[in-house]
Amino acid sequence: MGADDGAISADKVDIRLQPLNKNGAQDETDEEAADQIQLRVYKQRWIVLLAVALLNNTNTMSWIGYAPSGNYVNSFYGESSAAWLSMVYMMCTIPVGMFAMWAGREWGLRTAVLIAGWANGIGAVIRVISSLDFVPQDLRFPICMTGQGIAAIAYPFIMFLPTKVAGSWFPDTQRAIATSIGVMSNPLGVLMANLISPAIVKSPEHVIWLNIFTCVPSLIAMLIATFGVNRSEPKIPPTFSASKPQMDFVSGMKSCFSSKQYIILLIVMGGGIGMFNCLYTVMLELLCPSGYSNFFSGVCAALMIVGGVFGAAASSIFVDRTKLYEETLKIALGAAVIFGLIFLQLTLHQGYSVILGVTCLLFGVLGLATYPIGLELASECTFPVSEATSTGLIVLSGQIQSVIYVFIMKNFARPLQPDRMHIQVCQLTPDDTINTPKDNTMSIMIFSLLATLLVLTLVVLFKPVYKRLEAERGNRATADKAKELSNQNKDRITLQAESAVEPLQKK
């Protein structure tokens, strides 16, 4: 066989391996399709979520920690100090919240985590200083309020982080459970505060130990946030929606407030958050007039949270698999309001400890189950608005409504009837004029009416469109089709060119 034969043989091999390529644009399209479907999840997502969860947990402990031991805190810092140390969180969130949402969108997740971590840690240290022996009595409360105010500044930066982390770092099959872990660290902080605060604080002098208890984990969270979160987003996104550019802050705000379904969710979910915050704040004041102790108040709050952890985890796994966000939210919130109303009515009577505990548990299972679902729905209704904006507005609405509900509970309460004074356990001593027991009947009636109106609004008017899921399904279908076409083209042989080659002849 001569040189020409060898050339023909080589050409034949080349032809058989040559894929079909009608024009130069085909290769470019295939490359774009490959880039389009490039998704990846990183193990670092769990470190980022841990940092956010710890910040949420420790910041909430700082917020709620004084309420379960309010009578001792009032004696140590001054009259009504426990309520003000809780209220400062709600008041700081409102003015700082808008800036925090803008900063989270413009500066990124890592900057928000750093601001939250350092504000939380510095505030905790100042609270410890306020309770040291050398601090004069008249300076204790101002110093403590300063530290609490600095820690409160961290909360608006924390409030949108769970959904932001879930949307930026986690695949769509883990988004709801990631959001649940992030947001449920908040009520877990409430649980720890309500269990440990009454156990630590047995007299006014023990308040310093409560401050130390909240300070140590706050400093740990600050260190993890500083060294564990080194970037705002992964290099390669985990989902199609995470790869899509999000609206700027102003456009996102306009989009949110032009959506009827989002506005309904904003009011209802904000109301739910506000009512939970209010109950945490005034739990002792609700129960002590009917003879229920500080410890029992802490147990009730703990049962709510324990139930809520299981409820939120179960609901998150369920909606991750089924995507039945709307149905789950409506059923859970409706049932939660029923058990919540029963609980409130029972607080007006003595001797119902077991039933109060059961209703607290069921209220927590169903009520807190709605929290992560509602925040995920906010992202669904407003996509491609940044999660920092859509969920931040809901939590901000919750803080505003918290102030309203606490105001209602305190200002519509009346002096306790004389024939019930022998039942109450609010006063530390018979001549205690700081911890005055109240009759909460009117407050509870107004509170119950508002809760009923909120759930009816949700059930009747809320009919969302899952914009984020629809976008991901469309992108996934397009990418799968492009990938399939690309694979077919690569496997196809140019038969026409092959047939033009003469078979080799033996000499």
From Swiss-Prot:
* A GO cellular-component term linked to this record: membrane
Which protein, by its recorded name, is this? Answer: Uncharacterized protein B0416.5
Basic and acidic residues: compositionally biased ranges: 477-493
Subcellular location, in the record's words? Membrane
Q: Which UniProt keywords apply?
A: Membrane, Transmembrane, Transmembrane helix
GO MF terms held by the record: transmembrane transporter activity
Topological type in the membrane: Multi-pass membrane protein
Q: Where is this region: Disordered?
A: 477-507
Among SUPFAM superfamilies, the record links this protein to: MFS general substrate transporter
Question: Does Transmembrane helix appear among the keywords?
Answer: yes
Q: What is the lineage of its organism?
A: Eukaryota, Metazoa, Ecdysozoa, Nematoda, Chromadorea
- According to the record, the segments passing through the membrane are 46-66, 83-103, 112-132, 141-161, 181-201, 207-227, 263-283, 299-319, 328-348, 354-374, 389-409, 442-462
**PANTHER family under this entry?**
MAJOR FACILITATOR SUPERFAMILY PROTEIN-RELATED, SOLUTE CARRIER FAMILY 49 MEMBER A3
Q: Which domain of life is it from?
A: Eukaryota
Pfam family for this entry, one: MFS_1
